């Protein structure tokens, strides 16, 4: 009996340590296999696609001289968010940092990417809570962006969500972000 107890303890500890590593957080109601990915976007892509409310670095600001410029400029003219549907490898190569994606493991015949750009304070966790198509063919994806209260950055930044999803026909894509403070 004493040999079983240490073995059982090792098994339980192993499961507790390694089981969460293989899980992808997608939440419920996800019939299209929508998965959040941690792919890095090219700086040039982000600069070409600004979003409203973000504090961007002011290129004309020089701390050595008092030229009346501020270190940051808040975008007040761009859209509040931007959504991109990536269905081909060539598109992806122009958007993703090359060292963060293995194109040999992506089958663009069976899956595609959706990129959503928006302004936010730093989040530590994003979870897809729903991915479904409505009666009009609109692919609706909802995700939670969780931020620990008190850990926000002092200025809004341009944030992104990269979603890999099974190929499906749709008329439009609608993404909803629910911000949750914990």
Segments the model singles out, each with a brief description of its role:
Residues 23-182:
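Exposed, flexible binding/inhibitory loops of compact, secreted disulfide-stabilized domains
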Residues 1-6:
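Positively charged n-region of N-terminal signal peptides that target proteins for export
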Residues 9-10, 163:
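Enrichment for repetitive, rod-forming helical segments
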Residues 7-9, 85:
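Generic alpha-helix initiation/capping and coil-helix boundary signal
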Residues 10-20:
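Bacterial N-terminal signal peptides
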